[in-house]
């Protein structure tokens, strides 16, 4: 077996092992959800929430969420430390939905000022994954206890999340292949006309997280280059595919 074939086999093995545990955790997460009466809708919402959190794990491990590689875990711990729990004051309502809908799902210039204190510096991820979902509109009283997220984070924290395709040196390293694999199992349905590939996922994360982050940091170093007539915009205008 060649090195390339062996690496591909190792990646597939880790991905499949992750997926088997994912199925178990998905079922457990479904059981925590309250406020959705239809079983099919509850299952779909559980899948949506775990898919959202997997995307977040990939970008937080690169430091793109307020510079914190354990962003979700730390925010959960901080909220629980306040002791202000109760209806609509748990992690799901008080923090996570606001992160999804008002943070990742909304451009920074459209956010409320108080949101920065709650979320810190987080990017805008265009594409719809973090928009208010139809299920969230149909079931406005959804509740998910903190214990559900503690369990998911414990599962996710057992893996090392990478955006690139580095050779697996350890058997707990995963890359966006795992998202493509799970989307294929849960989302790629002919009746929906929705198909996701590894390239779609990697490109989405790069376009909406890595590239904007790099431009923001570069602008801090050299603001003049980003003025309307600056060199950066000239390069982008003249040769957008290259730059």
Label each PLM-derived region with a short phrase.
Residues 1-243:
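Preference for the N-terminal adenyl/adenosyl cofactor-binding alpha/beta module
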């Amino acid at each position: 077996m060649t090195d390339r074939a062996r690496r591909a086999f190792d990646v597939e093995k880790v991905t499949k092992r992750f997926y088997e545990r994912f199925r178990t955790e998905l079922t457990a997460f479904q059981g925590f959800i309250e406020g959705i009466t239809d079983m099919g809708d509850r299952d779909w919402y559980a899948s949506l929430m775990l898919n959202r959190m997997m995307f977040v794990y990939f970008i937080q491990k690169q430091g793109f969420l307020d510079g914190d590689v354990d962003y979700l875990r730390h925010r959960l711990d901080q909220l629980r430390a306040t002791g202000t729990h109760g209806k609509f004051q748990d992690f799901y309502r008080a923090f996570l939905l606001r992160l999804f809908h008002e943070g990742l799902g909304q451009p920074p210039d459209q956010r409320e000022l108080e949101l920065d204190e709650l979320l810190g510096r987080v990017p805008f991820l265009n594409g719809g994954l973090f928009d208010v979902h139809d299920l969230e509109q149909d079931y406005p009283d959804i509740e998910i206890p903190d214990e559900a997220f503690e369990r998911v984070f414990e599962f996710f924290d057992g893996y090392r999340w990478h955006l690139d395709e580095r050779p697996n040196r350890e058997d707990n390293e995963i890359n966006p292949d795992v998202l493509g694999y799970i989307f294929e199992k849960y989302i790629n349905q002919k009746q929906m006309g929705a198909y996701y590939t590894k390239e779609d996922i990697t490109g989405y994360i790069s376009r909406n997280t890595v590239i904007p982050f790099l431009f923001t940091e570069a602008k801090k170093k050299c603001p003049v280059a980003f003025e309307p007539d600056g060199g950066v915009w000239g390069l982008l205008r003249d040769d957008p595919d290259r730059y």
